[in-house]
From Swiss-Prot:
The chain crosses the membrane at residues 79-99, 112-132, 141-161, 165-185, 199-219, 262-282, 300-320, 327-347, 349-369. It comes from Arabidopsis thaliana. GO terms for cellular component: Golgi apparatus; Golgi membrane. It holds the Pfam family TPT. GO terms for molecular function: antiporter activity; GDP-mannose transmembrane transporter activity. Keywords: Antiport, Golgi apparatus, Membrane, Sugar transport, Transmembrane, Transmembrane helix, Transport. This is GDP-mannose transporter GONST2. Belongs to the nucleotide-sugar transporter family. GDP-Mannose:GMP antiporter (GMA) (TC 2.A.7.13) subfamily. Coiled coil: none annotated. The lineage of its organism: Eukaryota, Viridiplantae, Streptophyta, Embryophyta, Tracheophyta. PANTHER family: SOLUTE CARRIER FAMILY 35.
Length: 375
């Protein structure tokens, strides 16, 4: 499951614009529902996480003796949950990069399908064991959700291919374009006014992306094209999800749709699309014949990336419950720093001084954007 899922549900890293828009409207909250990979699964992670916080406060109040017990771990809660969220999101991107580049695995759609299958199986097991509750699906709900899922699949696939061709640091910086597209979409679709600080931060993001591309010693036109497509699809997913949510709730018997159900629905509906793409692109021949799939460590890494996709979803919910939208958004922005540095070090990326400054400037622009959206 990509990091842009529940940033998130997979490859997808929630995006600051998504969370801040929802927090601006009081009761409207999110997931990551999960960048994107990171990011890919980023806007969804934050959106779902916000909604989980509302549900938690409403149905699981803390009082009496429970309040005293809760207080004893309150100080360590934010630190532990924040560390878990950062580690899982960083690990997700690094593992996907290892599978696609280090193992030279040329079947991004197949990897996405495998990760989503793992997510479905884990959620199903949790549902059967009574750990979570999943809404019963019907054809009306599936028809309403289908446009969102088509964009979701495109978001994950484009994220996989971009990560194969571009180094992790540049992927992280280019993902800032998602914030720009989402911010513009909010203006035209939801009539949401952006303050001058937000527009200034967006301009900084554009400068960092352009300068980063010009100074990138490993520049790959195919990879950059995939990443720009991913930014467009991630922003579209975030904006479309907001419009579809109310209709989706009305399509269920209970009149509600919790976050876990959304995770399962998105991943379950993506499986037929994944199978069709694998057949059309001929990936199944490659998967059967390549020596990579005969390597047991490859399957260990690929399976771990699938579990990490779900881990991002749940740790983002946990961290948001322990802190709040402001802290969550800032940590999400700052989390790009260790991801970028880890990507540069682990994969021995050729780096020039101008490109390094472009990356650092882009990371700074992301933090400025998060602060501006909350001001």
């Amino acid at each position: 499951m990509s990091a842009v899922k529940l940033e998130a549900i997979v490859c997808h890293e929630p995006d600051e614009s998504e969370l801040s828009h929802l927090s601006d409207n009081g009761s409207k909250t999110k997931n990551g529902v999960v960048f994107q990979l990171l990011d890919q699964k980023s806007s969804e992670h934050r959106w779902f996480s916000e909604r989980f916080l509302r549900w938690r406060r409403r149905y699981l109040p803390v009082d009496g003796d429970n309040r005293r017990d809760h207080g004893s771990v309150k100080q360590s809660g934010p630190l532990v949950s924040g560390a878990a969220y950062c580690i899982s999101s960083c690990s997700m991107i690094i593992l996907n990069k290892i599978v696609l580049s280090s193992y030279n695995f040329n079947a991004g759609v197949s990897l996405m399908l495998y990760q989503n299958l793992i997510s479905c199986l884990v959620v199903a097991v949790l549902d059967i064991s009574g750990v979570v509750s999943v809404e019963k699906f019907n054809w009306k709900l599936i028809r309403v959700w289908m446009p969102v899922n088509v964009i979701f699949v495109g978001m994950l696939v484009s994220g996989m291919y971009s990560l194969k061709y571009i180094n992790v640091a540049m992927v992280t910086i280019l993902k800032n374009a998602t914030n720009i597209l989402t911010g513009i979409g909010e203006v035209y679709m939801f009539r949401k006014r952006q303050n001058n600080k937000v527009w200034a931060a967006m301009f900084m993001m554009i400068i960092s992306a352009i300068s980063g591309g010009i100074t990138d010693l490993t520049f790959d036109a195919v990879g950059y094209t995939w990443q720009l497509a991913n930014c467009f699809l991630t922003a579209s997913y975030s904006l479309t999800l907001r419009r579809v949510m109310d209709k989706a709730k009305q399509s269920t018997k209970s009149g509600s749709l919790n976050e876990v159900s959304m995770v399962l629905l998105n991943n379950l509906l993506s499986i037929p699309f994944g199978i069709i793409l694998i057949i059309l692109l001929g990936e199944w021949r490659y998967v059967i014949s390549t020596d990579v799939t005969k390597d047991s460590m490859f399957w260990v890494v690929a399976t771990a990336s699938g579990f990490l996709g779900l881990a991002i979803s749940f740790t983002s919910m946990w961290f948001l419950h322990q802190t709040g939208p402001t802290t969550y958004s800032l940590v999400g922005s700052l989390n790009k720093v260790p991801i970028s540095l880890a990507g540069l070090v682990l994969f021995n990326v050729p780096l020039s001084l101008p490109n390094l400054f472009s990356i650092l400037f882009g990371l700074f622009a992301g933090v400025v954007f998060a602060r501006a959206k909350m001001s």
